[in-house]
């Protein structure tokens, strides 16, 4: 296969999809961006700004918006999926006729499908099957879309099984402010990007309750242990979670003021109801949906996930966040790593 990448299509014009599209277009790569909302499409076309999802960022002339999926996919060497996880399958079904010539499908979605408990690579396998002959990759890491749009230094992980194709994509996406590292652990990178959103809701709730820095640090650290346990049970490499797609993305999402998931948690910690919060935002807090999937995955694989379980009870059973913290703190006492070495 010829690995040259001359055109990229990005499916989804939320903040992340628009930021990636603008990054590539500013570097000189022609980009076609699929925009679902008519109003957003007209904004980008007429004002060169996505005021709804990436306000204040002037978009490069090399970025072309389209409302037709067929037009957006025309001539693409790489197709980037940047849609929320709950619509990923449906959009991919609509894209099936337009994959001729696409060398790599790159998933920028951070989530898990609730009905099937599949990560996006598995959804791709089920939807496209043997009809798609190209590669699959995913990208994750500590990367707020607004900061990428402002050209602030950012580093992410790109996971793909074929190193040569990975290096070709790495070259296309990397700039003086956006650094891409390669990995071969697709499962780990996908799960790190998805599960950190659940922990971020918990971290936000702790902040909203006013429990301080000690509590937040403990929750992040023990949350990473849960992400790693579940990831390894699902076939991921444990060291992936010590990298950008693991602890990097987790720390950012649990501490950054731009984190939608942390914001949801903070508001719940301050006494607001989830339905009130979600009804007043156009941005997607993926962690709300991912919490349900993560809870079910813990049951399916028999993995102990106390923090994720408590976030689930807060969101879906209406549990008082203070009671959830109390129950976490008064659980049976344990060793940190689960066992003692034979000699010490």
Identify the residue ranges that each predicted region occupies.
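Rossmann-like NAD(P)(H) cofactor-binding subdomain of soluble oxidoreductases
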Residues: 59, 65-74, 78-153, 169
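Internal alpha-helical scaffold of NAD(P)-dependent oxidoreductase catalytic cores
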Residues: 87, 98, 123, 130-135, ...
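NAD(P)-dependent Rossmann-like dehydrogenase/reductase catalytic/cofactor-binding core
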Residues: 203-207, 232-242, 250-344
């Amino acid at each position: 296969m010829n690995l040259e990448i001359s055109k990229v299509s990005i499916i989804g014009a939320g903040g992340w999809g628009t930021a990636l599209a603008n990054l590539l277009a500013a570097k000189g790569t022609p980009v076609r961006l699929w925009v679902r909302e008519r109003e957003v499409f007209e904004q980008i076309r007429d004002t060169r700004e996505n005021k709804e999802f990436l306000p204040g960022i002037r978009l490069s002339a090399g970025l072309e918006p389209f409302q037709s999926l067929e037009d957006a996919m025309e001539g693409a060497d790489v197709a980037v999926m940047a849609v929320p996880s709950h619509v990923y399958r449906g959009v991919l079904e609509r894209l099936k006729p337009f994959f001729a010539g696409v060398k790599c499908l790159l998933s920028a979605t951070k989530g898990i499908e609730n009905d099937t408990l599949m990560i996006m690579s598995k959804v791709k396998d089920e939807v496209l099957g043997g009809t798609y002959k190209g590669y699959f990759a995913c990208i994750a890491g500590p990367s707020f879309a607004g900061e990428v749009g402002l050209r602030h230094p950012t580093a992410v992980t790109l996971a793909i099984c074929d190193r040569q194709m990975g290096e070709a994509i790495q070259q296309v996406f990397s700039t003086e402010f956006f650094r891409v590292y390669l990995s071969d652990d697709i499962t780990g990178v996908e799960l790190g990007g998805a599960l950190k959103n659940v922990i971020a809701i918990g971290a936000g709730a702790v902040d909203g309750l006013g429990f301080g820095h000690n509590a937040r640090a403990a929750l992040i650290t023990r949350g990473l242990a849960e992400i790693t346990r579940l990831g390894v049970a699902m076939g991921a490499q444990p060291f992936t979670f010590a990298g950008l797609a693991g602890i990097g993305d987790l720390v950012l999402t649990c501490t950054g003021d731009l984190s939608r998931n942390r914001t949801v948690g903070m508001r719940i910690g301050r006494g607001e109801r989830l339905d009130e919060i979600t009804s007043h935002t156009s941005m997607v807090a993926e962690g709300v949906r991912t919490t349900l999937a993560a809870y079910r995955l813990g049951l399916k694989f028999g993995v102990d996930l106390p923090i994720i379980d408590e976030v689930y009870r807060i969101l879906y059973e209406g549990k008082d966040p203070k009671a959830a913290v109390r129950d976490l703190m008064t659980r049976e006492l344990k060793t940190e790593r689960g066992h003692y070495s034979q000699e010490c």
